[in-house]
Amino acid sequence: MFEHRLRRPFLVGLLCLVASAAVAATPDAGDWLQWRGPQQNGISTEHPLPSTWSPKGENLLWRKPEFASRSTPVVMNGKLYSICRAFPETTQEGEKIVCVNAATGELLWETINNVFLSDAPAERVGWSSVVADRDSNSVFALGLGCYFQCLDAETGAVRWAHSMSEEYGMLSTYGGRTNYPVVFENLVIISGVMTGWGEAAVPAHRFVAFDKRTGQAVWFVSTRPRPEDTTYCTPILTNFAGQAAMVVGGGDGTLYAFQPRTGQVIWKYDASNRGINTTPLVHDGIVYCGHSEQNAAAPDILGALFALDGRRKGQITEQDLLWKIPGRTVGRSQPILIGDRLYATDDGSALWIIDT
């Protein structure tokens, strides 16, 4: 079932939104186009922000628990987008992309899809998040069943779609880990563990770049074959010494910098023997990242937090790192940099503050 509904008169599910003030009227003020925000670092540039809030009403603009989801919503042009369950606990259960008025919570449209060729339970719908693009006025979403869509941001009409599991052999496992799209110039890039035929017959974490307006594939690249994990690391777009770069952790445990226009590898660092889920942080050419698995250089130690110079080329070794703290299991949460202090939350919920 693939269904689209526009401007329904009643609500069928939603999430909570805390507002700092009235939603801005200008097209780009207050936009939050991907889950880590406008600077890809988890820091809001808006002021003032509320210092306190409560789900019972303090600084709460509206609340729609029916659309609750593990997915982080995004905002563009006064509209909020997210992924959540459709018809939960029924024989028609699937997933849907919803668009609501960010100021009022009114449902504007929703697009409903089946979840198929996946072992993931329904509770893991929304592991990925919608990504919005002002230039094409589109939103992009990868569903739990690896159904990748480009939707008209105003109406929800499907502009193009790819069933990544059927076309590219993308795997959606019980863990439900699906990756986040990233928009670069005329491209939208998505990745996942894929297995196909010919040279792609062996499973590998692979990246595919599509023309964001037509859905036509532009480039396709593989990482090291037979990875241990599927992952949900979000690619970070940046530039190193004037060269555009996409920094992302792979299912093979390697942190990569790719040329986003071509997919060519700029550099790579073998951090772990298992997949990297932590979204890297890039600031002034320095890459900060972590993981909570076996270290590639010391398999008897779990986890590490590290920094490297993103302006390097080729294979990065342990000796090339700026610093590394083994044994810190920072395997889920992206670090945040404030001044010269790096704030990182480990998998046990301990907060570490590092002098960079």
What spans do the regions from the language model cover?
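Noncatalytic, solvent-exposed loop/strand surfaces
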Residues: 24-356
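N-terminal secretory signal peptides that target proteins for export/translocation
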Residues: 1-7
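Bacterial N-terminal signal peptides
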Residues: 9-21
